[in-house]
Design a protein with these regions (language model features):
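Glycine/charged-rich beta-loop-alpha catalytic/anionic-binding loops adjacent to active sites
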Residues: 69, 94, 115-122, 222-229
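Structural motif
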Residues: 10, 75-76, 98-99, 124, ...
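Rossmann-fold NAD(P) dinucleotide-binding segment
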Residues: 64-71, 75, 79-97, 109
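Rossmann-fold NAD(P)-binding glycine/threonine-rich loop
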Residues: 83-86, 90-91, 99-121, 137-139
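C-terminal substrate-binding/catalytic lobe of Rossmann-fold NAD(P)-dependent oxidoreductases
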Residues: 3-66, 146-271
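Rossmann-like NAD(P)H-binding beta-loop-alpha module
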Residues: 133-145, 161
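Short glycine-rich anion-binding loops that position phosphate/pyrophosphate groups of nucleotides
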Residues: 78-79, 101-102, 126-127, 209
C-alpha cells in the first residue's frame, strides 16, 4: 500500500483553502497536516465538517518547522503566490497552485527553480475537470469557425478580469486555429467597451456579481449557425476532484507542469 500523501494548505482560512482542507480530509490516500494564513490568530484550525484540527501558522516557513508536508496547495494571488511557491520549492515541498495573477516572468522563475531542484509544481488556472474539457474542445472547434466570443462571469470578490481560465481558453482557441479570428468592428459604438476586450479577434466579456462562482461560455459563429460551449461551477467543491488529482500527480513530478490538461493527457491547453 502506498503511504499517505501529507498536504498543507496556504491560505487555509479563506473560502477555497477551507474547502481544500475538507477535501483532503475526505480523500483516500491523502492526509491534511497543516495550514498557513496571514490572518492566523491561533495555532490550529478545525477542518470544516470534521472534528479534526491541524497546526496553523501565519507563514509557510513557520508551518514547516512544525509539520513539513509532501505537498502544499496554494490558492493565494499574485506576488504572494510566487513567493509562497518559491518558499515551498526551496524547502523541498511540492506545490499544487491555483493562483492567478502570475506573470510570464513569475512563471519562468518558478520553472527555473523547479527544474534546478527537481521539486514538482503544478500550476493551473482552473481545477474543474469540466473547464479543462471545455478548453480542449474549444481548441478543436476553433479550426472550423471564423468568429468567436468568450464570456465569463464570477463572484464579486474576484480581483482579476478576465479570469485566468478565460485567458487560457482564448490561448487554446488561437493555438487550435493557428491564426487570429475574424472580428466585426462596430462602426458606431454608443457605449465604449460594449464589444469587450480583444484577444486575437476573440471578443472577451467579464461579469462580476454576487450569486455566482464561475461560468465560462464560448460562442462560435459561422454562416447560418452558431456553436455554444458552457461550463458552470456551482460551488467550490467542483474544483476539488481536480485539486486532489493534482496532489496525487505532483508527488511524482520533478518540474513545473502548467495546466490540468497536461495532467489529464489532453495536450497543451492549460487551465
Amino acid at each position: 500500500m502506498s503511504p499517505e500523501i501529507t498536504v498543507a494548505v496556504n491560505g487555509a482560512l479563506g473560502r477555497m483553502g477551507s474547502t481544500v482542507l475538507s477535501a483532503a480530509a475526505a480523500e483516500p490516500g491523502v492526509t491534511p497536516v497543516g495550514g498557513a494564513d496571514i490572518a492566523a490568530s491561533s495555532d490550529s484550525v478545525t477542518i470544516f465538517g470534521t472534528s479534526m484540527s491541524v497546526p496553523l501558522a501565519p507563514r509557510l516557513t513557520e508551518l514547516f518547522a512544525i509539520a513539513k508536508p509532501d505537498v502544499v496547495v496554494d490558492f493565494t494571488n499574485g506576488e504572494a503566490a510566487k513567493e509562497s511557491i518559491l518558499t515551498c520549492i526551496d524547502a523541498g515541498v511540492r506545490v499544487v497552485s491555483g493562483s492567478t495573477g502570475l506573470s510570464p516572468e513569475d512563471m519562468e522563475e518558478i520553472r527555473q527553480h523547479s527544474s534546478r531542484t527537481g521539486v514538482g509544481v503544478i500550476s493551473a488556472s482552473n481545477f474543474a475537470l469540466g473547464a479543462v474539457v471545455l478548453m480542449h474542445l474549444a481548441g478543436i472547434a476553433s479550426k472550423y469557425f471564423d468568429y468567436a466570443d468568450l464570456l465569463e462571469s464570477h463572484h464579486e470578490m474576484k480581483v482579476d478580469a478576465p479570469s485566468g481560465t478565460a485567458l487560457s481558453i482564448a490561448e487554446a482557441m488561437i493555438e487550435g486555429r493557428g491564426s487570429r479570428f475574424e472580428q466585426n468592428v462596430a462602426d458606431l459604438q454608443t457605449l465604449p467597451g460594449t464589444r469587450g476586450g480583444d484577444f486575437e479577434g476573440i471578443n472577451v466579456h467579464s461579469a462580476r456579481m454576487p450569486g455566482r462562482v464561475a461560468r465560462h461560455e464560448v460562442v462560435f459563429g459561422a454562416l447560418g449557425q452558431t456553436l455554444t460551449m458552457i461550463h458552470d461551477s456551482a460551488n467550490r467543491e467542483s474544483f476539488m476532484p481536480g485539486v486532489m488529482l493534482g496532489v496525487k500527480h505532483v508527488v511524482n513530478d520533478t518540474e513545473l507542469v502548467v495546466g490540468l490538461a497536461n495532467v489529464l493527457g489532453l495536450g497543451k491547453s492549460k487551465p
